[in-house]
């Protein structure tokens, strides 16, 4: 049997499993890194989105079926950085058929520099307002010269995207937290970019991995972050400044299973300019871990 025949069956089984366990897992888990949650109150995050990279293998095989699975979980908002063999028009039609939306579109450095018009077309066709860059090319380790180049590029690309009514956000990836004076090179980038044209997407994993605190960063720059990636880190592990992990499955876990305190982060995020939050799960068992993570993150209250 071919993979294309197998995947729809897998999606159907996953949907059945999700529906069956939703009733069983209605209360917050007690063995995660989050602060203690109450049994009543307002949801901190009632409507999280998801990053398409989470379901990259499933999208590669069956785009409509994967969208159906995401919708069944309760997720309505997807950040795409890949069209998975479709045109932007075709993908938009599939989203519209399911009342799904795309609010952010990811593009890499090369695409932004060499195919800018296509990025604009795809983002606007999908309905995204935000264009996100998740990696700035550099020779490790990231240094002040790299940060200065990044500042120049971000200011320029942010202005160009604004001309098309699009907002540019840079997604931190851990390597920017090299110490520099009284702060880090991430501080240097934030402080030297134009807040009118340059925004940021906080990936909480890639803040914790190099040893920093997402809450402190949100409190320091409450008006600079527009987007957030929610991704958990295995308990007991520590990271570095490379911006990479040796093995995703060794260091990353489903939301609520690791050491990151999402209760505290989402509390702090209430006082910031963040518009959209996206679940990003990079482990192998996303068909089970994402529904569980969704139930966990939407159970947090204040």
Where are these regions (language model features)?
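Bacterial N-terminal signal peptides that target proteins for export
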Residues: 1-8
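C-terminal motif of bacterial Sec signal peptides marking the signal peptidase cleavage site
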Residues: 17-20
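A cross-family glycoside hydrolase active-site/sugar-binding cleft signature
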Residues: 49-53, 79-81, 103-108, 132-134, ...
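Acidic-and-aromatic substrate-binding clefts and catalytic sites of carbohydrate-active enzymes
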Residues: 55-61, 77-89, 107-115, 138-142, ...
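Active-site acidic/histidine proton-transfer and metal-coordination neighborhood
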Residues: 77, 109-199
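Short acidic, glycine/proline-enriched helix-loop-strand junctions
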Residues: 87-105, 150, 164-166, 297
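Alpha-helix-loop-beta-strand connector modules within alpha/beta enzyme cores
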Residues: 92-107, 154-157, 191-195, 262
